């Protein structure tokens, strides 16, 4: 199933998601295409959030912003509908996670603005092409994600700590992994830390704040990349009336080819 899904087109995956036939994490799916995180908030907060993303481009690289009231990401995936095409969503009310759903159409408002934020799943195929293993794909689980003590630059009501994703990499390949991913700044780029998780406030790799723990083997080093789940941690601090996000690991498959995001 994994290999079959990796060969699908973005539209094929989105159709499965839209029909409710695929509700799990999207790592490895439509492998040549960029995946996106989601934040939906009301128009009166959209400028401050866009400013937050501009000031924090490492964790929050913006791939597309919808027109107010429109669920169509006209640049990233013109045939998509952000209300139905993510496998799972989270509803936050006053900073508290209250619901997890597979369709946000009932929650959609005429002044809602959707932000698509780059996802590190998008550079995983480039790592695989360099024979660098991706443990969460191999183990069939969600990527582990952790809150750090790295401060984001505030904007309006939005402030908080960066969230990172972690992939165990053989020590001899860690520098190569950094080189490969540095080509993709639109989907988080180079790592923010190689090894020493305590230095960024992570005390236990076996207890991720989001996603699932993975095996770190002898001779491997944990490598951390800025993560598009950062807005969810920030939203918990800002406590707006309602914000909708993707569920961590459950992304939109866009029509943007991964290689088109590479800078070298």
Curated annotation (Swiss-Prot):
Family annotation (Pfam families): D-Glu_cyclase
Gene Ontology MF terms in the entry: lyase activity
Recorded superkingdom: Bacteria
Keywords: Lyase
EC number(s) on file: 4.2.1.-
SUPFAM superfamilies cross-referenced by the UniProt entry: PSTPO5379-like
Keyword Ion transport in record: no
Transmembrane helix listed as a keyword: no
Family: Belongs to the D-glutamate cyclase family.
Designated name of the protein: Putative hydro-lyase RBAM_004300
Native source species: Bacillus velezensis (strain DSM 23117 / BGSC 10A6 / LMG 26770 / FZB42) (Bacillus amyloliquefaciens subsp. plantarum)
